[in-house]
Structures are given as structure tokens and as C-alpha cells.
């Protein structure tokens, strides 16, 4: 699963996920892309589950790019622990997703195969997504 190799600080504040994606919002590497319409967080496990679903569907043909990386640590306190005594330990990492962010890209397969693979991947994700085709000159 994806996670940072090392961080300057182990824990991070919650913050707010606002605005729309102004970078990473176009199909750059492949021919087809899966773009987020909704806003939210994707855990490293969700990103990996969607990648596996796509990889299994396209079998050996084609290439997949993951355009997001889970770099925000989410901390949790253990079950049945009283409040106070500091912040909990980092449990998992998430990628914060704004509307318009390109999540995955694919190349080397037909459009029908790419659509179906992205449909299977989108079922694993808690966001609304849409299928994108690379624009000429982009």
C-alpha cells in the first residue's frame, strides 16, 4: 500500500478540504482517465483496491497511472480509552480529493475496456467519478 517513506512530523491537524483541483485535473499520461466529481478522502486501501480491480479487468494489456498519493496521516485513539492524554497514533494515510482531480489514467486499451475497468474501480471508491478521454493538444 502507498504511504510516505518519511515525514517531517508524524501527526497532522485535521484541516478542511475546500476548493476545486486546479492542478492534476487533466488527462496527462494516458489516453483515458477517471476524474473525481465529488470531494472527500481516499485511504491507501481504497486506492489499492481500485487499482487491483482495474488491473484484473485489463489483464496484461495497457498501462495504469495512479495520479494521487495518500500523504496525510489520520490518527486514532484505541478503543475504550478515556479522553485526554494527547493525540492518538497515526493509523492510516489518506489522499484529500477535491472535485476535478484526476485519480487514475490508462493507456494501451480500447475505450470500452477502459470504461468498464474504471466502472469497476469507481465501485470501490467513496466518491462520484466520471470517465475522461484525452483532449487534442492537452
UniProtKB/Swiss-Prot annotation:
The UniProt entry's sequence similarity note says: Belongs to the universal ribosomal protein uL16 family.
Any matching Pfam family: Ribosomal_L16
Report if keyword NAD is assigned: no
Which NCBIfam families does the entry link to?
rplP_bact (TIGR01164)
Please describe the quaternary structure of this protein.
Part of the 50S ribosomal subunit.
Q: What's this chain's function? A: Binds 23S rRNA and is also seen to make contacts with the A and possibly P site tRNAs.
List the GO terms this entry assigns under cellular component, sorted alphabetically: cytosolic large ribosomal subunit
Classify the source by domain of life: Bacteria
Underlying gene: rplP
Q: Where is this region: Disordered?
A: 1-22
- Extent of Basic residues compositional bias: 1-13
A molecular function annotated in GO for this UniProt entry is: rRNA binding
The cross-references to InterPro entries, in alphabetical order and at most eight, read:
Ribosomal_uL16, Ribosomal_uL16_bact-type, Ribosomal_uL16_CS, Ribosomal_uL16_dom, Ribosomal_uL16_sf
Q: Does the keyword rRNA-binding apply?
A: yes
Q: Which PROSITE patterns match?
A: RIBOSOMAL_L16_1
Q: Which UniProt keywords apply?
A: Ribonucleoprotein, Ribosomal protein, RNA-binding, rRNA-binding, tRNA-binding
Q: Per the UniProt entry, what is one GO biological process? A: translation
Listed name of the protein: Large ribosomal subunit protein uL16
